[in-house]
Amino acid sequence: MKQLLDFIPLILFFITYKLGGVREAAIVLVVATILQIVILKWKYGMVEKQQKIMASAVVFFGLLTAYFNEIRYLQWKVTIINGLFAIVLLVAQFQFKTPLIKKLLGKELQLPEKAWNTLNFGWAIFFIICMLVNIYISHNMSEEAWVDFKSFGIIGMTVIATIISGVYIYRYLPKDGSNSKDGEK
């Protein structure tokens, strides 16, 4: 339910854009995002920090898009958010020696430190790729192509990155059913 709720604003944005246009789609996106946060708070008692940041960015850039009737503000949001995610992951790993992926998944998975660093770096590269592809599409293709990319392309890229991460993690999982604390083979 929670994951489905994350996609509702995007789906409504896509449909409204195809039926109405940029301004209408941006307004629907902002309203749906605010409702999503209200529902999450009501149903689960809290909203995760990452969701608050994303919702704030959607509301800010969505309102700019609606006010100016110009999609470039939402295009900037995708670029900025992906860039920030990459920077945060890289700074945490190289400056503070703490792979954030480990903080997110460390309770569920026991992996060697090298694996956490590789995963963290891989996701940082993924966000950089998303940022660069977004810049390319938003500057060199039609508005409709960008909306399609935003609605489906990034999701597809995320699924591929998740599968690659899963395959990478699999090699560190215990083979005999034991629960190895350090995740070493």
UniProtKB/Swiss-Prot annotation:
The chain crosses the membrane at residues 27-47, 53-73, 76-96, 118-138, 149-169. It is a multi-pass membrane protein. InterPro entries: YciB. GO terms for cellular component: plasma membrane. Keywords: Cell inner membrane, Cell membrane, Membrane, Transmembrane, Transmembrane helix. The keyword Hydrolase does not apply. It comes from the Bacteria. It is found in: Cell inner membrane. Plays a role in cell envelope biogenesis, maintenance of cell envelope integrity and membrane homeostasis. Belongs to the YciB family. NCBIfam families: ispZ (TIGR00997), PRK00259.1-2 (NF001324). This is Inner membrane-spanning protein YciB. It comes from Haemophilus influenzae (strain ATCC 51907 / DSM 11121 / KW20 / Rd).
